[in-house]
């Protein structure tokens, strides 16, 4: 098959790449500012009125909508913004763009430095933990929740104490508290900004007396100061951070340590995206490239599904069921006991 293109085609393609890069940032901003929700509900909005109502800089708001229009997400008719042909799909995947740009933007911006081995020492990259928590709350809701609730409904018991490793915004514990009125929750989170966000969230939603958070690293669970509360936990969850346990020898040790730290856990729900295998470069779906490349830059090993299957028994757990998630890269929720 010929790969030749005309100069005109090449220029247009490169312009589209450039504009799509700008639009990618605008998607996360439009979501966070409420524009995507308003467009999803009403089908249109007035950009000038939207800017004035939300105390936003009008020329910059116009630029944001222009970026979205350049790739068919919206259409512009003067100051009126209408949904475009790709709006629904973008609105569904908006949190993935937010994770990439608002949450991980600094990592990708510094790519030339991060790729140099001489620079890969100490804290050689930065990400915005609060922005990542903001995005991951909706990513979890839209992609992991169906599998999560399927696992919860099949527990066969009513938990009394739940712990969430890498608890982020606290949404997972809030969901569990809503489902089981008598349950208490404990979140273990390494990022102070995420804990601050989570504490505000649980207080706002009326769960401040049932859900609490402690700063700690699930990979070093023995160092977490809430160890005395772990023995009460009978349901353990961990979503979108299990890959941080790897490489293999670390994953086995971390799983063993978690098993020992939570001796009375009856079910451990572990959900994460895994590394894909064999997808042609031009057929990669949304999120996959950013997730895998981003973690490669951070030096975080991403296991495949088969590699996960190979560590549970050695790590002190038995996998009783797997819930495959095909809508987000190659993701899964493991039920462990």
Across the structure, where does each feature detected by a protein language model lie?
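Conserved class I S-adenosyl-L-methionine
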Residues: 158-168
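Conserved SAM-binding loop
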Residues: 198-199
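C-terminal alpha-helical "lid/dimerization" subdomain adjacent to the S-adenosyl-L-methionine
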Residues: 269-315, 319-322
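Conserved SAM-binding loop of SAM-dependent methyltransferases across substrates and taxa
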Residues: 169-181
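Conserved SAM-binding motif I beta-strand of class I
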Residues: 184-189
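Conserved SAM/SAH-binding beta-strand->alpha-helix loop
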Residues: 191-193
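A short, conserved alpha-helix within the catalytic core of class I
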Residues: 244-257
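Conserved Class I S-adenosyl-L-methionine-dependent methyltransferase catalytic core
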Residues: 17, 62, 67-160
